[in-house]
Amino acid sequence: LKKKSKIKLQNNNNPPELIKIEDILNKMKMTLHYSENLSRLTALKELQMEEDNDPFKILIGTILSARSRDENTSKIVRKLFQKYKNVIELANADVNDIKSIIHSIGFYNTKSERIKQVSKIIVEKFHGIVPNKIEDLLELPGVGRKTANCVLVYAFNKPAIPVDIHVHRISNRIGIVKTQNVKRTEEELIKIVDEKYWLVLNSIFVMYGQNICLPIRPKCQMCNLKDICNFYTNQKKN
């Protein structure tokens, strides 16, 4: 089926209207452009823009980024790969050494084990090369759809929609979808967002979620999307 290029918004206070996802992304970028004290690029975007654009480094960065601040993720990724230059070295690393390097990041015990396991599987099953198919990525321990989709987008430039808490929250607030979890949000976004926007959607939504559409006390007055935002409308009522 051909992807729809327009999205029907579910605003409870206005008649349904059609709006291009391009308009939403452009309004987000405009708000971010004129925002003060803007945080830097997301950790994954920074890794993508590095000269080597190493898929393995992006995979490990994605694993480390779960429930971690981007600035901390970037710092830990750099520190980890200063010691272990490639997948083979990490596959042979002592888990306790990995823990000592990433201990300042959330869930470092679990993540250290995951990094070691993932590295060994990539060496033994995929000949040291990070797979570029979602089915193969999902076989890796601790790798779910969000992580797999992030690797596809940021490492291989393959169209996918990584849905994290920011993408899920914003999509529901502005009425693009009406879903209860990230899995359903991804399913709905795939249906209604033109594939040509899949590569950029995550990075823009995440930046917006980190800086403007915060989970608590969002900066609604700065937002160019408040006219279609159910959250903002409900806040005004109260």
Identify the meaning behind each predicted range.
Residues L59-L64, I115-V123, V130-G175, T185-E188, ...:
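Catalytic DNA-binding helix-loop module of base-excision-repair DNA glycosylases/AP lyases
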